[in-house]
């Protein structure tokens, strides 16, 4: 069975900046609304079908949560759905924010 990979926030930012990957955030709606990584798609049970229709299965997908734990399960789920290159962002949004990477806030 295929497995997801791990990526640090700097590597994730580099892929996103070059337009080579799609970032999804699986945190709760309130946390996402307060602040999220720039250009992140809020992936929920309600938005997964829409996401799967919009994104090519060959396009790398980066999964972000709070601290890099929950994202691993979601990343494996996306692999199981047929996405070919899926990464769990180590450290999650907390590490992204600590690294002063681009954030969209309300």
Curated annotation (Swiss-Prot):
Main localization, broad class: cytoplasm
Chain coiled-coil ranges: none
Domain Rhodanese intervals: 17-105
Catalytic activity: thiosulfate + hydrogen cyanide = thiocyanate + sulfite + 2 H(+); thiosulfate + [thioredoxin]-dithiol = [thioredoxin]-disulfide + hydrogen sulfide + sulfite + 2 H(+)
Function recorded in the entry: Transferase that catalyzes the transfer of sulfur from thiosulfate to thiophilic acceptors such as cyanide or dithiols. May function in a CysM-independent thiosulfate assimilation pathway by catalyzing the conversion of thiosulfate to sulfite, which can then be used for L-cysteine biosynthesis.
NCBIfam families xrefs: PRK00162.1
Name recorded for this polypeptide: Thiosulfate sulfurtransferase GlpE
Organism: Vibrio vulnificus (strain YJ016)
Lineage: Bacteria, Pseudomonadati, Pseudomonadota, Gammaproteobacteria, Vibrionales
